């Protein structure tokens, strides 16, 4: 039986102070190698908090978090997971710290212990794979929103993660950048959990779907455009519409 990269077992998560009601309760989740999970739900239901809990940035109030079967309890226990699980934040600017694209993308490999030459080669290779060849000398703050998002993804992928956590990756992207990101993720074998309100995007890049209902994580299925007859709340005459 294939061992999950990470798993959560009966996890409850709450914001401080301690008496606060849980944001999520009795969460059971595992991510297998090569698995692509799409996570959706209304704003404020705890999706981002769940990703932060996986990486130890928000600690569970109860339950067990495992990485390759090992229970994570102390801060130092999460180090190996954070090196192996890449987290792409909603706002790309939160992950871009250096003047040039090359410096940003090479930062992760350098932290993993690669030499400057190896980190540069890894960064250039990753930029090329994402269609960003020639970007290495560009100033990060002058990039478009879509370009910044791709560079932040490149910075994570340059670390060769076992899994990705993507928080609203299409947020603020124009149609061209969204399509480019969709094409990249659709062919990327790396295991991942993707949060998105963009249904079309989520169904193209995910193979399993989950949502959050009443503070609990549930398996779900994607919605598709359809037509049906029903009584409209502003009138009793049945009518047809396209979603």
Tell what function each PLM region has:
Residues 55:
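Helix-to-loop junction immediately C-terminal to a conserved catalytic motif
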Residues 117-135:
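Conserved ABC ATPase "signature" region
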Residues 40-42:
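The feature captures the beta-strand-to-loop junction immediately N-terminal to the Walker
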Residues 63-74, 81:
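Conserved ABC transporter NBD signature motif
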Residues 139-143, 147:
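Conserved ABC ATPase signature
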Residues 196-197:
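H-loop/switch region of ABC-family ATPase nucleotide-binding domains
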Residues 164-168:
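Catalytic Walker B motif of ABC-type/P-loop ATPase nucleotide-binding domains
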């Amino acid at each position: 039986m294939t061992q999950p990269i990470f798993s959560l077992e009966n996890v409850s998560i709450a914001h401080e102070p301690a008496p606060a009601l849980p944001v999520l309760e009795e969460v059971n989740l595992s991510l297998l190698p090569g698995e692509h999970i799409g996570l959706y739900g209304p704003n404020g239901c705890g999706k981002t908090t769940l990703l932060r809990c996986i990486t130890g940035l928000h600690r569970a109030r109860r339950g067990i978090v495992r990485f390759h079967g090992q229970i994570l309890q102390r801060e130092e226990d999460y180090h190996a997971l954070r090196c192996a699980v890449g987290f792409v934040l909603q706002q790309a600017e939160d992950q871009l710290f250096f003047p040039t694209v090359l410096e940003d993308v090479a930062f992760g490999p350098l932290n993993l212990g690669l030499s400057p030459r190896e980190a540069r080669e890894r960064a250039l290779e990753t930029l090329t794979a994402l269609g960003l060849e020639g970007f290495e000398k560009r100033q990060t703050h002058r990039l478009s929103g879509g370009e910044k998002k791709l560079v932040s993804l490149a910075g994570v992928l340059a670390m060769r993660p076992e899994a990705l956590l993507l928080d609203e990756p299409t947020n603020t992207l124009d149609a061209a950048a969204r399509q480019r990101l969709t094409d990249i993720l659709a062919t990327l074998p790396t295991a991942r959990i993707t949060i998105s309100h963009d249904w079309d995007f989520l169904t193209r890049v995910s193979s399993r779907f989950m949502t959050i209902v009443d503070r609990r994580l549930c398996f779900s299925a994607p919605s598709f455009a359809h037509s049906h007859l029903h009584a409209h709340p502003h009138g009793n005459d049945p009518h047809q519409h396209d979603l």
